[in-house]
A protein has these predicted regions:
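N-terminal beta-strand motif that seeds the catalytic metal site of vicinal oxygen chelate
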Residues: 1-17, 69-72, 125-128
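Conserved catalytic-core motifs of GNAT/GCN5-like acyltransferases
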Residues: 7, 27-38, 96-101, 123-128
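Core segments of cupin and vicinal oxygen chelate
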Residues: 8-49
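Vicinal oxygen chelate
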Residues: 13, 72-118
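Active-site beta-strand termini and strand-to-loop segments that position acidic
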Residues: 43-47, 109-114, 124
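Short, charged/polar surface micro-motifs in flexible loops or helix N-caps
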Residues: 46-50, 58, 75-81
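Conserved beta-strand in the GNAT
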Residues: 51-54, 110, 120
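Acetyl-CoA-dependent GNAT
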Residues: 54-59, 124-127
């Protein structure tokens, strides 16, 4: 058994792709319109696990604080550098960090994507 993908509703597919593909460097792998009339776009990093972004103008996203989704973690080489670069190049909000997480043996930071979804940037560190 393996995780294949996670699906997230978004308000603007192009803005979402600009962030995840353009700024974070993930790869767009597929796109189609589903039976629910939603535009579905898939992206992934180096692993086979994908993120599915769904958009339908008739779908109410709700407020970020009322969603049950907590966060998405993305591995990076340099948390501090990525935070600095993303804050310069995008409208992302830094929620917490960068900080050392000794329990996770990583340097982490929490930011937002264009729809307010929380993204954890994770730099694995053996020295923590």
């Amino acid at each position: 058994m393996d995780v294949i993908h996670s699906a997230i509703w978004v308000s603007d597919v192009e803005e979402t792709l600009d962030f995840y593909v353009g700024a974070l460097g993930l790869e767009k792998t597929n796109e189609f319109v589903g039976g629910d009339d939603a535009r579905n776009v898939y992206v992934r990093g180096e692993s086979e696990t994908e993120i599915q972004f769904k958009h339908n103008p008739d779908h109410d996203l709700g407020e970020p604080s009322t969603r049950r989704f907590d966060h998405l973690a993305i591995e990076v080489d340099d948390t501090d550098g990525e935070v600095e670069r993303l804050r310069e190049e995008t409208d992302t909000e830094l929620l917490r960090g960068p900080l050392d997480s000794t329990g996770a043996s990583a340097r982490v930071a929490f930011i937002t994507d264009p729809d307010g979804h929380v993204i954890e940037l994770v730099e694995p560190r053996e020295d923590l």
